[in-house]
Amino acid sequence: KFKKELKKYKKKYLPEKYNQLELLDELCNPEIDFYLSITNRGDGKSFNYPSSLLYLSYHLDIGVTFVVRHFTLQQRIRELVEEILVTLNWYDVSQLWFRNTDDYIVIGLGEKEIAIITDLNNASDLKYSSQVLKDFPIIVYDEFLALSGDYISNEYEKLQMIYRSIDR
């Protein structure tokens, strides 16, 4: 069912000149725990991966966790989700909603919760939300190379802690 929905998404919403999301072809491969997509700017991965994963989340009930480096970037993910729905029009944007909690933001479409947004500094607190997080097993951490002062301390360990809270 996953491959069928992914193929449908790619055919209808993914222009040929952009990143063709080959990593998603292997998303259900039990031999692979995580994927890295390292490409130049402008190939569409920062729009097309989130878009396709939100689409699949809605249609297949596979939740997505968007992780950002700093709390202030959570708003950018909210804006990206709205932009995706307005641009591709695969769902009525007026049915999009957000619910804030202390540690994450829930993204919903209609009656479904399809994703959450959190930041790396919530890694320790998120372990107390593992009952919720387990429903959002696909983690998207789309970050660019930053100036040395923009990185947070223990960045890798914090991402690993979030992964462990989800992968129970």
What is the predicted function of each stretch?
Residues 102-156:
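Conserved RecA-like ASCE ATPase "motif II neighborhood" in helicase/translocase motors
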